[in-house]
Amino acid sequence: MTELAVPSGWALWRRQTLAVARLELRKCFRGRRLIGITLLNLAPVVVLALTHVFPERELALYATATNLSQMYAVMFATFMLRAGIFFTAAALTIQLFRSEALEKTLHYYLLAPARRGIVVAGKFLAAAGASAAICCTAVLLSYLVLFAWLGDAMGRFMLEGPGLGHLLGYLGATALGCLGYAAVFALFGLLWRNPIVSGALLFGWESILFLLPPGLKLVSVLFYLEALLPYRPQVGPLAILAEPPPAVTSVLGMLAFTAIVLALAGWRARRMEISYSTD
């Protein structure tokens, strides 16, 4: 009789991580949180679509490739990067970590025959993947709707001009932002009973990025993401300028940051004890 090969080591950990991720991914795409997240991310798409339904002559005259590129850069940096990505990753990640402790279901995972770091990695992949899917879809739709003002020239701008490259840059920054913020909120959800307070402090920190000295900008997720943008919006007179890192440094830095924060989250999970009598 042929014996079935039982996976072990990295193969077993990979299978367990993907199994947890698939299970948690279903949770991300249901519930009332998804409605608010979807409305938040689709708000720019709806606003831009309304400009086509109720067109203004001034906007039609303003609709050149350069002007629209600058307009989208401002919208992406001020709303999508600072609000859409941040709150989407926060809502989905906190739901998968801290909410399960409040609902008294987290202990099922902690008692399972799997490393706690595997559980953290699977939940993180689900939250980051769902966040990236929602936010990247909003970025793609808003980009196409805005540049539809170019009319027949849109195809040339996308295929022969910088349009497609710019779109890929925005999508890449969005995906990296979802990874970074999902890792941070995974750690917050394991460290504190109320990660919303720490999330609010993080949001405040990212909001005053332009006022921070160059040394403190290095510990901001937003600083590395802004370095990946094809267009960087102008900052106000009170801003403290800092040389943005190269794109390769930003990507590698964000990936390293995510790995370090996830390692801390796994370390915290291994020492975590669930006490429902005090929650």
Task: Give residue spans per PLM region.
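Membrane-helix interface segments
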Residues: 32-34, 115-117, 121, 162-163, ...
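Membrane-interacting alpha-helical segments
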Residues: 14, 18, 22-29, 165, ...
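Aromatic- and glycine-rich beta-strand/loop motifs that create alpha-glucan
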Residues: 2-38
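Helix-loop-helix units of permease transmembrane domains in multi-pass membrane transporters
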Residues: 95-129, 277
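Transmembrane helix segments
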Residues: 47-58, 192-234
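Hydrophobic core positions of alpha-helical segments in small-molecule transporters
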Residues: 37-40, 121-122, 134, 198-201
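Junction motif at the cytosolic side of a transmembrane helix
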Residues: 187, 256-279
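Secretory targeting signals
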Residues: 8-10, 45-95, 120-191, 231-236, ...
